[in-house]
Amino acid sequence: IVYGETYSWFNDAFTLVAELIAEGSYRLYPDRLSLPQNNSNASTITITPRWCNLGWGYCPTNKPQWKDRYKIAFALPDKNTLLPTHVYVNQEPELSDCLQSRPRNYRLTQNISNVASGDYIWAVGIVDNSNNNEIGIQISTREDITSEGWLTLCDVTVQ
């Protein structure tokens, strides 16, 4: 077929194809965060992120096969290796609720008494809890991503 559907996509509607490539699907990222930077390891911390979706689509975590599989998590990677030493999964957010132009605010309260004193980095990611809380969905950003897929945020000292 010389002038089939694919031909029309690229010749008659290429601007729509380019728009779909740029904005289609889901693109999740935290656009606002409140993170503690100095903590006692006997304390309870509170993290308040706001998540946005830059894409038209939604993350289908409301489907039975993905239900509660992917969750937002915060990590304390070792400052030298950037490997997570502690991972805190936030059970509250439902990623399918993150829709374009509708930012969602969440809260994670966590006891960090098991964290050894030292210097760490706060990091955030979307983990797959069926795969040992490894990164399961990449956050929509190009910079400050570790080799494990965590988005690094800021330094933190635990005393």
Placement of each model-derived feature along the sequence:
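Long, contiguous interaction/targeting segments characteristic
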Residues: 1-25
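Extracellular/luminal regions of secreted and cell-surface proteins that mediate adhesion/ECM remodeling
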Residues: 18-159
